[in-house]
Amino acid sequence: MSDSGQECAFVVDGLTYRGIEWGNPEGPLIIALHGWLDNALSFSVLAPHLAQFRLVALDLSGQGHSDHRSADATYHIWDDVPQLLGIVEQLDEGSVIVMGHSRGAAIAVLLAAALGDRCSHLVLLDGMLPIPAEETAAPQQFVQAQRDREAARTRRRRHFTDVAGFINARVKLGFSESSARLLAPRALRPHDNGFELTHDPRLNQASAVKLTAGMIAAFYASLSVKTLV
């Protein structure tokens, strides 16, 4: 397998998840989940150090080259889990190492809980489950999600005249120039003599429901897997 990895794709529940596979096809399987508005290329720097593993880095739904969810769907951190379980089944491995970065780390915790004993190790990079929500804030959170959804109906997709425009925009958000340049091939697609973002704009919307402190503690307590944070 080349240093640049090999494209892969999985169809589950009518959604196509695309990604990149690196390493040893016969090695222990790692499912790698990227952060918010990133894509599978965020693991390309780490991949050479994991050459003995079968590293499958996925573009989560609505990001990179993977399908967007249907118009009536949402992007809560648990929404990808059923499809990720389906991908694990398609890969047909007895056990799996789950690795996630940032938002992907939160999803990784939920996936590990759902996999149970099939998850041999859990690796959380710069993230865990989200900061817990106060129960009293639930109505406000729910209403904000509805407002965001309504506002998005008339919002135009971000457009860039060139790749440099995307890189500069990411740098202004606090990302390094090198990381922005790394992600660009899967973060952009050609459009109107320039480029537009590939991610679903709904990923910018507030979640309608968030986990409370008690719920988060219960998820952590349910895990018995070896975990690296």
Regions found by a protein language model. Name each.
Residues 1-30, 51-54, 92-94, 129:
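Alpha/beta-hydrolase fold catalytic core
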Residues 12-15, 56-99:
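Active-site loop/oxyanion-hole signature of alpha/beta-hydrolase fold enzymes
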Residues 18-68:
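Conserved HGGG/HGGXW glycine-rich cap/lid loop of the alpha/beta-hydrolase fold
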Residues 45, 110-114:
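Active-site signature of alpha/beta-hydrolase-fold catalytic machinery across serine-
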Residues 100, 104, 108:
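Gly/Ala-rich beta-loop-alpha elbow adjacent to hydrolase catalytic centers
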Residues 113, 120-159:
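Flexible "cap/lid" loop of the alpha/beta hydrolase fold
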Residues 150-155, 165-176, 186, 205-208:
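Helix-loop "lid/cap" segments that line or gate small-molecule binding pockets
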Residues 190-229:
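Conserved serine/cysteine hydrolase catalytic core
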